[in-house]
């Protein structure tokens, strides 16, 4: 007798999404297991960030299901969805810190808005997370006084402050130079492992993708055309994947060929 699988932390089942007459996602299926760091890679505008919005429940799928553990996101009532979102952290492409608030206040905001913790408990949690990302000494400064890499660290502290089960990263290397990008990648790895957090990372930066990911999925023309471990992706015989990873100008991506798509 087959034993039922435990619910994945995140699962997309044959998800389709239309914007007006355009089909953005075409039958996307993904499964993110506990403690995975799943990297979704693909060209700019391919729908990678749209998948994060589906997981957060900001967008409902046209058809198919998006699940967080046993819960189908699009079927949840508003209060239940708000509760589920407290179990998710989000690191935005350009950090999305409030310019009128100090670093400490930015990190404290989710706890102030979504919990009944005391001021002392909030301050303790904020200090702990800022110390984890090496930013405790700038907690009284404003975001405008900090570098892009520092703001990214603070965004990560804010994402961790609710002790989530899942963190979503939208282009974590955006706007960073290669050295700082590597530092942020290593910080993401160490903190997600230390905090035992599952994560989904959207990026088109291949160096970051292969540093961070335990599993990878390639999104192309609205479909997942390949998924596997980083080593499996490197060995892929799919010409779209091979071209994307190599950065070659020769191949089906620029030609717009449909022949290379072989959805798994």
Annotate each predicted stretch with a short phrase.
Residues 56:
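Helix-to-loop junction immediately C-terminal to a conserved catalytic motif
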Residues 64-72:
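Conserved ABC transporter NBD signature motif
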Residues 71-72, 119-137:
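Conserved ABC ATPase "signature" region
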Residues 142-146, 150:
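Conserved ABC ATPase signature
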Residues 161-165:
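A short, proline-enriched helix->beta-strand linker immediately N-terminal to the Walker B motif
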Residues 167-170:
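Catalytic Walker B motif of ABC-type/P-loop ATPase nucleotide-binding domains
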């Amino acid at each position: 007798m087959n034993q039922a699988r435990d619910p994945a932390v995140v699962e997309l089942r044959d998800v389709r999404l239309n914007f007006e007459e355009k089909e953005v996602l075409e039958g996307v299926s993904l499964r993110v297991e506990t403690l995975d760091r799943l990297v979704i890679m693909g060209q700019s505008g391919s729908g990678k960030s749209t998948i994060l919005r589906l997981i957060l429940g900001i967008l409902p799928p046209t058809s198919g299901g998006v699940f967080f553990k046993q819960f189908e996101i699009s079927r949840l009532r508003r209060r239940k969805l708000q509760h589920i979102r407290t179990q998710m952290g989000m690191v935005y492409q350009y950090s999305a810190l409030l310019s009128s608030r100090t670093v400490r206040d930015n990190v404290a905001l989710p706890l102030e808005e979504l919990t009944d913790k005391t001021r002392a408990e909030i301050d303790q949690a904020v200090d702990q997370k800022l110390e984890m990302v090496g930013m405790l000494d700038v907690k009284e400064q404003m975001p405008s006084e900090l570098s892009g890499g520092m703001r990214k660290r603070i965004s990560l502290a804010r994402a961790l402050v609710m002790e989530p089960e899942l963190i979503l990263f939208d282009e974590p290397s955006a706007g960073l130079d290669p050295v700082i990008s590597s530092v942020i990648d290593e910080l993401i790895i160490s903190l997600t492992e230390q905090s035992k957090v599952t994560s989904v990372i959207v990026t088109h930066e291949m160096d970051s993708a292969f540093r961070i990911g335990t599993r990878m999925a390639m999104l192309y023309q609205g479909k997942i055309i390949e998924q596997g471990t980083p080593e499996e992706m490197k060995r892929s015989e799919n010409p779209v994947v091979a071209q994307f990873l190599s950065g070659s100008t020769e191949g089906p991506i620029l030609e717009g060929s449909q022949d290379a798509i072989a959805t798994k």
